[in-house]
Structures are given as structure tokens and as C-alpha cells.
Amino acid sequence: MGAIPLEHGLAVAGILFCLGLVGLMVRRNILFVLMSLEVMMNASALAFIVAGARWVQPDGQVMFILVISLAAAEASIGLAILLQLYRRFHTLDIDAASEMRG
């Protein structure tokens, strides 16, 4: 089995990133916004892996680990904010967050 060509891997990463960006802009539910952010971060991680494999450098794998670590931190903080938003307003609508003042 051969390696995936650079163009194909970057095209898939670009499509995933665009899908995540569209989901980020269109959705009003904070859970879907978080999922769209995860898709975007995984697309960038895929681009790093594909580029690292193309030039036979371990830098892509190192950046992949960094991106996955950042995605885990973002998910945990985002879910904590989601829970607090739901407890306070009983909705997951992101526009309700504009009412939070403190």
C-alpha cells in the first residue's frame, strides 16, 4: 500500500476545515459549535500529519500531539461553559450567552 498523496490529504483536511467553519457560523447551539471547533482542529491536525509524512519529518507528529492536546483542553473548558449556560438559562442557544453579565 502506498502513502496518500499530499494533495489528497490536504484536500480532505481543507474540506473538513470548511465544513467545521460553516458549522461554526451557521449553528446557534453551543454543542454544535463545540463539535464544529473540534472538526476544524482535527482538520488542521490531519494537515500536519500529511505534510509531515510527505517530507518524512517527525514535526507533523509533534504538532499533531500539540493540536490534540489543545483540542482536549478546549473541549473540557467548552463543556464546562456549556453546563453552566444550561444550568443558568435552561437553553443551549449561544445568543443567551450575551445576556450573561457579571
Swiss-Prot record:
Enzyme class: translocase
Transmembrane residue ranges: 6-26, 30-50, 62-82
InterPro entries: NADH_UbQ_OxRdtase_chain4L/K, NUOK/Mnh_C1-like
GO cellular-component term (any): plasma membrane
Alphabetized UniProt keyword annotations: Cell inner membrane, Cell membrane, Membrane, NAD, Quinone, Translocase, Transmembrane, Transmembrane helix, Transport, Ubiquinone
Predominant location category: membrane
Any Gene Ontology biological process: ATP synthesis coupled electron transport
Membrane topology qualifier: Multi-pass membrane protein
Superkingdom in the source lineage: Bacteria
GO MF term list: NADH:ubiquinone reductase (non-electrogenic) activity; quinone binding
Family membership: Belongs to the complex I subunit 4L family.
Subunit text: NDH-1 is composed of 13 different subunits. Subunits NuoA, H, J, K, L, M, N constitute the membrane sector of the complex.
Name of the protein in question: NADH-quinone oxidoreductase subunit K
